[in-house]
């Protein structure tokens, strides 16, 4: 599952745009002669925050195809045995998981990887890299596909969108509360004065800063959902196959990460980061060692 990219980057961009619109056209609805109307502000921020998150959710599948170069497999005309096997395996796993058959695709990447995305568990996309097809045996590949189907069946994208929407709302709310405080106490705005340019600049900057800091909450959920998807993969394809697939992926963690930054949240594996690396609090995936240890504790064949 590629680290928190496509969804979060799109969401952050929409959040900033929503914040600008809110600051320019919605100030009068929560700014009065006596200062901030916190009740109105919270409601407005909740609406704007959820809109940003839902836009990201509905765009996720389209963005995934564009950023990774995923080529969909025609379910009625697979071009070779590998494509035919992928379609059959995904169809079987989807049926067992109780979801509709997702779109299936292949994206060009030497790194072994895969992802699942989509706004609805019955309208999803599962894609694997060309490198994954070349280097994994069928049992391991089936486990990876089961892991991705697990993400879809668990409704991880919808849950992520709801969490991100709430986070967005509080980011926008506190950015404006802090911005108003600074505008009054640093720039000297009086109660009877409208917010000035300093207020708008401060809230825009705080939207970005608070958005990055608050992403730690979303990162925590991303790590949690990996354990759940691993469990789903183990139950659908076998625990040993899931462990074997993860250990094979571990050997590639020293390779440079070839996934677009926008898609890292949804990949099954992360390559080695180039340059500065954020603290574990901002990691979207548990380590392979942690994931394998959790699988060993799982009570399933």
From Swiss-Prot:
Cofactor mode of binding and number, as noted: Binds 1 zinc ion per subunit.
Similarity-based family: Belongs to the peptidase M48B family.
Coiled-coil parts of chain: none
Organism domain of life: Bacteria
Protein name according to UniProt: Protease HtpX
CDD domains, sorted: M48B_HtpX_like (cd07335)
Enzyme class label: hydrolase
Subcellular location: Cell inner membrane
Organism encoding this protein: Acinetobacter baumannii (strain ATCC 17978 / DSM 105126 / CIP 53.77 / LMG 1025 / NCDC KC755 / 5377)
Principal location listed in the UniProt entry: membrane
Entry-linked Gene3D superfamilies: Metalloproteases ('zincins'), catalytic domain (3.30.2010.10)
One GO cellular component term: plasma membrane
TM stretches of this protein: 4-24, 38-58, 155-175, 200-220
An MF annotation (GO) of this entry: metalloendopeptidase activity
Catalytic activity, EC: 3.4.24.-
């Amino acid at each position: 599952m590629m680290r928190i990219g496509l969804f979060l980057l799109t969401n952050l961009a929409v959040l900033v745009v929503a914040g600008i619109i809110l600051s320019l056209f919605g100030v009068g609805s929560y700014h009065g002669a006596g200062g901030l109307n916190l009740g109105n502000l919270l409601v407005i921020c909740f609406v704007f925050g959820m809109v940003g998150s839902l836009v990201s959710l509905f765009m996720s599948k389209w963005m995934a195809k564009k950023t990774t170069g995923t080529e969909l497999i025609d379910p009625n005309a697979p071009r070779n045995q590998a494509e035919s096997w992928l379609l059959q395996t995904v169809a079987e796993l989807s049926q067992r998981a109780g979801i509709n058959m997702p779109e299936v695709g292949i994206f060009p990447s030497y790194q072994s990887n895969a992802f699942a995305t989509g706004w609805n568990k019955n309208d999803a996309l599962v894609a694997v890299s060309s490198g994954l097809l070349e280097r994994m045996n069928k049992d391991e590949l089936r486990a990876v596909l089961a892991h991705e189907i697990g993400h879809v069946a668990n409704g991880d994208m919808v849950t992520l969108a709801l969490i991100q929407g709430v986070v967005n709302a509080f980011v926008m709310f506190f950015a404006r509360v802090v911005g108003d405080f600074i505008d009054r106490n640093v720039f000297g705005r009086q109660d009877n004065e409208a917010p000035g340019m300093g207020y708008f600049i401060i809230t825009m900057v705080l939207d970005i800063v608070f958005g990055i800091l608050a992403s730690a909450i979303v990162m925590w959920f991303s790590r949690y959902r990996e354990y759940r998807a691993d469990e789903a993969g183990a139950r659908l394809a076998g625990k040993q196959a899931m462990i074997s697939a993860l250990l094979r992926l571990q050997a590639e963690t020293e390779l440079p990460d070839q996934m677009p930054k926008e898609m890292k949240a949804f990949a099954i594996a992360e390559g080695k980061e180039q340059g500065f690396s954020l603290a574990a609090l901002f990691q979207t995936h548990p380590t392979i060692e942690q994931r394998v240890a959790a699988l060993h504790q799982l009570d399933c064949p």
